[in-house]
Amino acid sequence: MLLALGAYLGDFNGNFTWERIGAEYNAAVPVRALRAVPALCGALTVPLAYLISSQLGLSPLGAFLAGLLMLMDNALLTQSRFVLLEPLLICFSLLSVLCALKLRAARSFSVSWWGWLLATGTACGLAIGVKYTGVLTLLLVCVLAASDIWRLAGDRTLTHLCVCAHVVARVAGLLLLPLLLYVATFWLHLQLLQNAGPHDHLMSSAFQASLKGGLARITQGQPLEVAFGSQVTLRSAHTPCWLHSHFDVYPITYADGRGSSHQQQVTCYPYKDINNWWIIKHPHSQSLVVDSPPVPVRHGDIVQLLHGISTKLLNSHNVAAAITPTCQEVSCYVDYNISMQGQPWWRVEVLNRASDSDSWKTIVSDVQLIHVNTSTVLRVSGAVLPEWGHGQPEVVADLTLRPVHPGSRWTVEEHRHGRSQEQAEREQELRSPIPKHVPHDLGFLAKFYELQWKMLTFRVEEQEHRYISTPLQWLRMSSSIAYWMDPHTNAQIHLLPNPWLWVSACVCLLLYCACLVRYLLRRQRGISDLPAECWERFLLAGWLGLGGWAMHFVPYLLTERGLFLYHYLPAATFHTLLIPALLEHAHTHVVRSPAGRYALLAGCVAWLAAVYASHVQLAPLSKGTPALSAQQLSSLRWSEGWDFLVHPTQ
């Protein structure tokens, strides 16, 4: 929404659909206004790093170094130059940390204390609103809050009521406020975006029907209750596809030698099509029209589903499915005049019913179709049929599933009352407009829940990507991402780290752990190397640098989906903040002699010069200018994984 605000302020007229990454922008897209938002957030990381370091107790020189290191990170520079979310996430994460540190330093329950508490919760809510990984920042802040509560609980000068008040205030400010702010952003989002868009098919039929100009335009005249004789399309709630059949049959034998029923194929087709229409037929009647008055189909009723075009009944039997042999095959029954009889009876179970007498409703009801003879459930298996099945998703009958499998939920999306027994007239009905109007509305909480569920569970079918990397490759700096290349020269933009900076940060993580273990062992033996105030500052620096890095890095070790280098940027931001804290700690508390301190300062100056030289050396790949020769590009390669592009004509 912040990016959309930038586009709005840049007078964007909406005439660009953002369907493909890398698509060339037309003249109507205000590129500068869009890029201004992440660029501003990227720029703010520098003063935020300075303020955070100052709040940790670092000297002005140490805090200045923190901001300078942020400025010289090529990866942050590159990411902030594009319309991407990471700069916003990092900015709000650092703002959350700064506010949490300010809250910790403020006098309890003073006006400024309440202000910083609300600011911390707001910043955390904004971080979560940018990306779900903002939750990791919230957890980091909650760890600090929990340590404060633990410290207060041991303070005997405080009453039990006062400690409880601290707990309640932090729960309200650091948990409830971010949650309310997160929900509020979606409320505003849904208030502003009420029209249909190009990716509506990812959402449920009920969600789509609540949007203007999309499915609502198609379904606005539908009858509400499904009746015997109704003509319907059935959409899977799990996958954006519709129950479908065509005249092709299953092959007599599959590639693995198994035999099939050679019946008419039933699939789940991902596009709207005339072959998606089915007629809900009463099992004891030959009528294919809706009675007057209509007889609604209710929970528990037995129905037959007649394919509208081929006039074959939906069927299943004890034959293994084509791709998922642990399930039964689903077909439209073809009578070959052999001993295998059709079993075209299905029991309707309305899953979201208010009572057992509830009727089957268009768009509103989620239903399961239970095969009566075998007690199996109609569902999308998740597999895709081979060429003989036109690459369409497989539909199977599985054993009764508890809990309910998402692929077994079906929704009537399009619905009309059939009026003709003649096949030609029925086909004409399927192509004619719907005559009635029944509005379908979905409440905010239902929309909010569905959006969260889709964001958590939906995965685009991943293909092998050139720049996919692993978390361990991030630590070795053996991966990069090409963002742009000039069509005529070698000018290009790559997402690359500053090698000297990132290696130094990883070394500092190890050194901090070694120092922490040493201090803890000596304190266990009654030896305190640091005064209480310095020890607390040392722990606080570790909470921020080591804890922030681990909190934003370790979860990716458990992630199975494809990852890219930009996923590491929030963690890299935190480990960069540890460098000046550890250097100042070494200068103040570890190196005692004047000569040693001069040597440390000289080493720091030399190291900082190397970091700056590395930044300048890689700047052409961060900014896209000037164009480099193939030999120059080769000289910049720190790792074999840095896959630079060379123009064929260069």
Features from the language model and the residues they span:
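Interfacial juxtamembrane loops and adjacent helix segments
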Residues: 1-40, 488-492
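Lectin-like carbohydrate-binding module/patch detector with strong preference for beta-trefoil
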Residues: 190-443
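Transmembrane helical bundles and short interhelical boundary loops of multi-pass, membrane-embedded
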Residues: 106-108, 116, 149, 153, ...
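Transmembrane-embedded, aromatic-rich helix segments that form part
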Residues: 118-119, 133-151
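Short acidic/glycine- and proline-prone juxtamembrane loop motifs at membrane-interface regions
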Residues: 75-89, 133
